[in-house]
Amino acid sequence: MPDMSQLKELPFSTLQFYATAPYPCSYLPGRQARSQVAAPGHLINAGTYSQLVEQGFRRSGLFTYRPHCDNCHACVPVRVDAARFEPNRTQRRAWRSHQALRAFVAELAWSPEHYDLYTRYQQGRHPGGGMDEDSRTQYAQFLLTTRVNTRLVEFRAPQGQLAMISIIDVLDDGLSSVYTFYDPDMAGSLGTYSILWQIEQCRTLDLPWLYLGYWIADSRKMAYKANFRPLQMHVDGAWRETPP
């Protein structure tokens, strides 16, 4: 009889990949998108997922995918070289603005306080985008369902007010910034601060890369990622550093 425990360590080479049917693009209006999905999803563990991210994949809950669009290559996987990163003036200002915040690793579990912040963020920053109507179940499936090494980090003001939450995957060669949401009424570029904090965590953990997902030049929601340098892009199957 085969050792069933070996099934928990699915080699990357045995994964199967399939393309989804076309669906409306979330980032470029009027475009159709497709994704390449890694399967079987329930056997993708932390080590295998690290290899997938290195090949340009991301995850949404248990769904591990990368763009596979017809005649479009706008979505480019990007990662920051944590050791060599130097903040620009705007980023230094954001870092100073939120030094009073305290970060806590919390349980990756349902919390009414977290869901309330998520709802206010979506309604305040992305109204009409669809996610502003996410139910509790949709929220949990998106951010709380994982089979990899995931951390939920709370950022709180000195008085205890919840300002921001970052969901982060710990990989073999870095951190992957899954999603961040924050108080839309709080000034000072909290999203930028979150990325800077994650870069510092990479340095603390001696991990070389912070993976930021996909950069899309024509999407305002994604274009900001090019501001974090040195930045590498995954193009034609290889990581290449972008010009300064």
From Swiss-Prot:
Q: Which domain of life is it from?
A: Bacteria
Q: List, alphabetically, the InterPro entries matched.
A: Acyl_CoA_acyltransferase, Asp_Glu_LeuTrfase, N-end_Aminoacyl_Trfase, N-end_Aminoacyl_Trfase_C, N-end_Aminoacyl_Trfase_N
Q: Which UniProt keywords apply?
A: Acyltransferase, Cytoplasm, Transferase
EC numbers listed for it are: 2.3.2.29
Q: Report the top EC class in one word.
A: transferase
**Main subcellular location:** cytoplasm
GO biological-process terms attached to the record: ubiquitin-dependent protein catabolic process via the N-end rule pathway
Is Cytoplasm set as a keyword in this record?
yes
Q: Name one GO molecular function term.
A: arginyl-tRNA--protein transferase activity
Pfam families registered for this protein in UniProt: ATE_C, ATE_N
Q: Which reactions are catalysed by this chain? A: N-terminal L-glutamyl-[protein] + L-leucyl-tRNA(Leu) = N-terminal L-leucyl-L-glutamyl-[protein] + tRNA(Leu) + H(+); N-terminal L-aspartyl-[protein] + L-leucyl-tRNA(Leu) = N-terminal L-leucyl-L-aspartyl-[protein] + tRNA(Leu) + H(+)
Where does it live in the cell? Cytoplasm
- Please give the GO cellular component terms listed in this UniProt entry: cytoplasm
Q: Which NCBIfam families match?
A: PRK01305.1-1, PRK01305.1-3, PRK01305.2-3
| Entries under PANTHER family matching the protein | ARGININE-TRNA-PROTEIN TRANSFERASE 1 (PTHR21367), ARGINYL-TRNA--PROTEIN TRANSFERASE 1 (PTHR21367:SF1)
Family assignment from sequence similarity: Belongs to the R-transferase family. Bpt subfamily.
Q: What does this protein do?
A: Functions in the N-end rule pathway of protein degradation where it conjugates Leu from its aminoacyl-tRNA to the N-termini of proteins containing an N-terminal aspartate or glutamate.
Q: What protein is this chain from?
A: Aspartate/glutamate leucyltransferase
Q: Which organism is it from?
A: Bordetella pertussis (strain Tohama I / ATCC BAA-589 / NCTC 13251)
